């Protein structure tokens, strides 16, 4: 059998064994995709014992390409929500998550200096303790750039494997500890979260208002400042028994009922100006109007602003809402359309069908992947990661590397959405498949390289010490910031659990947090809020630590 065929066969065996290990769960918690690392260690041990030689160049390529695929697809997935998560609404959650990352780095630095832990080993422990595989890849990349011998770089994977199990267990224990210390009633916390959402300013809501302000009588909608802003959409107007789709030039009369869409604060301000909120239904049922959701798939409208498409003037159709990457937005006239945007349309059936044809509404396109943008994005990401950043006092130039470059490029492209006929939208199923393939390839190679010496290191070497260091790196930041967030910020327990899981970019921990309450989405929401920024910081942190420690000698 050729070296290539043998290497591929062994990698396939690693994937099978590792995924089987990952599917083993104890009380609903397992290693998940991280099981591939341990599958690689097991197979690698026996490969080493048998004296089998695999293709080193091929393993290196597969490891790096797997990492690139993984971080790129993560960036495309979270890109649309990354910059939004940095805004005020998620500022507090991101602040606490960033503190966890910083404190983890500080604990790592202290352990490195006090116990003189070799740099590759301590970076591996850090990556495993925070259960972040891209951090492992980024650390190995910067160590190679610094000229670290290959056998020492491979120690990073071994120490990562030592610290990884408690990294997963530690966050679950922290959630349990917070619940015990503060005697949390999960049902009450879920109800508080739902109440806060209902009273919050971030959700898109609706309000029906009767026009009672005499100053607005016989005025056009476009002449009423509160209705002519991009903060509120007037999607329906009912006069007597007639329901219509209003245009900017529609004349308002006393007694008209307006159906407004916007954030709660803006709706309240509009109600103070216009008149009184009423419970009267403005449903399209039984009328010649209907409400329908269509998806943007036509390349010709990508990047165009809603106002430039003139849907109201041409088709008498109003866009009441815009859903982008799962986030409901007010369909302001300045909003540019991106591939995969979901538009909420109000109008007559024939008119809605006409608008649907303009924007595409081809559901099958959502299941197709444009491969050209994928490779353009990966290529640009690799180029970005290769740009040297010279910092005074450092022995080598700092680079984003093969982990940071594709991630940042994917975040940017995911946020842009499309350029001309090129769009970076990727169907969730395709994104997940590429992401899982990438991480399986990466972890399989890391495990294979670590397997030969793993048992000896654990039983005769410093393996137990590495596990102890990992416990400190995992537990100290989580417990400290968890207590601060609960005591001083009065953070909701379910939100706190999601934030802790997000700060470790740990899907098993998110699954555990979601299972705390069957119907509440609090944990998932906070996880998604902090995940993009934390993932970026987790990849950058080991590179910064490596360069700083290397410079300090």
UniProtKB/Swiss-Prot annotation:
Pfam families: Asp-Al_Ex, TrkA_C
UniProt-recorded Gene Ontology molecular function terms: monoatomic cation transmembrane transporter activity
Matching Gene3D superfamilies: Regulator of K+ conductance, C-terminal domain
Keyword Transmembrane helix tagged: yes
Residues annotated as transmembrane: 4-24, 28-48, 65-85, 95-115, 158-178, 371-391, 393-413, 437-457, 464-484, 493-513, 533-553
Compartments reported by the entry: Cell membrane
Domain RCK C-terminal: 192-276, 279-361
Positions in coiled-coil regions: none
UniProtKB keywords: Cell membrane, Membrane, Repeat, Transmembrane, Transmembrane helix, Transport
PROSITE patterns, per database record: RCK_C (PS51202)
Disulphide bridges, residue numbers: none
GO cellular-component term (any): plasma membrane
Membrane topology value: Multi-pass membrane protein
Biological processes per GO annotation: potassium ion transport
NCBIfam families: PRK03818.1 (NF003007), YidE_YbjL_dupl (TIGR01625)
Similarity remark: Belongs to the AAE transporter (TC 2.A.81) family. YidE subfamily.
PANTHER family tied to this protein: K(+)_H(+) ANTIPORTER SUBUNIT KHTT, TRANSPORT PROTEIN YIDE-RELATED
Protein name: Putative transport protein YidE
Species of the source: Salmonella paratyphi C (strain RKS4594)
Designated gene of the protein: yidE
């Amino acid at each position: 059998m050729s070296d290539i065929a043998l290497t591929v066969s062994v990698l396939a065996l690693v994937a099978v064994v590792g995924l089987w290990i990952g599917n083993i769960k104890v009380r609903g918690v397992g290693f998940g995709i991280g099981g591939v690392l341990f599958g690689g260690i097991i197979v690698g041990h026996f490969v080493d014992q048998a004296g089998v030689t695999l293709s080193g160049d091929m393993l290196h390529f597969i490891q790096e390409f797997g990492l690139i695929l993984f971080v790129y697809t993560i960036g495309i997935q979270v890109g649309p929500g990354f910059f939004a998560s940095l805004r005020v609404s998620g500022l507090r959650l991101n602040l606490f998550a960033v503190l966890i990352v910083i404190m983890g780095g500080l604990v790592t630095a202290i352990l490195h200096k006090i116990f003189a832990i070799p740099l590759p080993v301590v970076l591996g422990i850090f990556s495993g303790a925070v259960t972040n595989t891209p951090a492992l890849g980024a650390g190995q990349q910067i160590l190679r750039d610094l000229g670290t011998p290959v056998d020492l770089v491979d120690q990073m994977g071994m120490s990562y494997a030592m610290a990884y199990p408690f990294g997963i267990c530690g966050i679950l224990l922290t959630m349990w500890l917070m619940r015990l210390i503060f005697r949390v009633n999960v049902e009450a916390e879920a109800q508080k979260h739902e109440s806060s959402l209902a009273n919050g300013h971030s959700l898109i809501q609706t309000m029906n208002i009767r026009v009672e302000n005499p100053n607005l009588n016989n005025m056009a909608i476009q002449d009423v400042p509160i209705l002519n802003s991009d903060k509120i959409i007037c999607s329906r107007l009912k006069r007597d028994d007639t329901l219509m789709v209003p245009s900017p030039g529609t004349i308002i009369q006393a007694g008209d009922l307006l159906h407004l869409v916007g954030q709660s604060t803006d709706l309240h301000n509009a109600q103070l100006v216009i008149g009184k909120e009423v419970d009267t239904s403005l449903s399209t049922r039984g009328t010649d109007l209907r409400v329908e959701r269509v998806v943007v798939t036509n390349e010709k409208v990508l990047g165009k602003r809603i106002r430039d498409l003139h849907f109201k003037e041409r088709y008498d159709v109003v866009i009441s809402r815009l859903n982008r990457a799962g986030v409901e937005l007010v369909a302001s006239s300045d909003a540019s359309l991106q591939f995969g945007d979901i538009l909420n349309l109000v109008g007559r059936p024939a008119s809605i069908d006409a608008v649907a044809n303009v924007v595409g509404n081809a559901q099958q396109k959502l299941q197709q992947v444009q491969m050209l943008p994928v490779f353009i994005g990966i290529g640009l990401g690799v180029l970005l990661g290769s740009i040297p950043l010279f910092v005074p006092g450092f022995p080598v130039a700092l680079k984003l590397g093969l982990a940071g470059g594709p991630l940042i490029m994917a975040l940017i492209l995911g946020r842009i959405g499309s350029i001309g006929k090129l769009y970076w939208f990727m169907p969730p199923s395709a994104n997940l498949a590429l992401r899982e393939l990438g991480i399986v390839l990466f972890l399989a190679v890391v495990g294979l390289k670590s397997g030969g010496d793993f048992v000896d290191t654990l039983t005769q070497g410093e393996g137990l010490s590495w596990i102890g260091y990992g416990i400190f790196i995992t537990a100290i930041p989580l417990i400290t910031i968890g207590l601060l967030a609960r005591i001083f910020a009065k953070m909701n327990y379910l939100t706190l659990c999601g934030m802790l899981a997000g700060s470790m970019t740990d899907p098993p921990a998110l699954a555990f947090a979601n299972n705390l309450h069957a119907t509440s989405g609090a944990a998932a929401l906070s996880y998604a809020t902090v995940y993009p920024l934390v993932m970026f910081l987790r990849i950058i942190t080991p590179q910064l630590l490596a360069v700083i420690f290397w410079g300090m000698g």
